[in-house]
Amino acid sequence: QSLIETGLKQNTDLLSAAQNVKAAEASLMSARLAYAPSLGLSPQGTISSFDKNAATKTYSLPVTASWQVDLFGQLLNSKRNAQVTLKQMKAYRQAVQTQVVSNIANMYYTLMMLDRQLEITKATAEILKKNAETMEAMKDAAMYSINSAGVEQSKAAYAQVLASIPDIEQSIRETENALSTLLGEAPHAIKRGELEAQVLPTELSAGVPIQLLSNRPDVKAAEMSLASCYYNTNSARAAFYPQITLSGSAGWT
């Protein structure tokens, strides 16, 4: 549980997805503000003097305002596109979060499985070593018709099992490094329990209704991506039509 909490806070892919959500929120705010009139202020001031007379100060404050009439739906489609893009980014973030949790749990149980495999392999190697030593002693004592072929075969079995231990240890290190990267940390040893101590569910679900598939974040993201393409197309079509802008200006001098 602590590893999952760490991954949800520090995983780089999840942090990137969160930044994408913030960018989509900013784009939606910009699309909403496009409906509001735009105002412009350009205050000016001059000081002039002729023939050593008193200086004359002149001030002006022109104000301009313009408002685009969304007659053909360009602004509307841009806003809707921003809305579905925000939903898409949120669904993508949820999908990344689900994947991060799944990968952390999978690697954690893989490490415990490798630990158990290493323990069994070392115990097996010890048994085969004692077996080879016993057969060697029996051959030297000429007991039970033990020949050299049998002794060499037992030694070969021991050597084969012994040679597999470094491979398992390498797999453990690689899995720890991959899990550390997933947690957003430098490679280090992962503290973990034993496989036998884990409590697994006794009842497994047979499946989910097909209606619930629409709740999957990746399905939602794909749906919102399709909607975004639709609104982008409508906005591009509206751009072919003339834009109607109402503008006005006022000033004070």
Residue ranges and their predicted role:
Residues 84, 91-208:
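Periplasmic alpha-helical coiled-coil/stalk elements that build and connect Gram-negative outer-membrane
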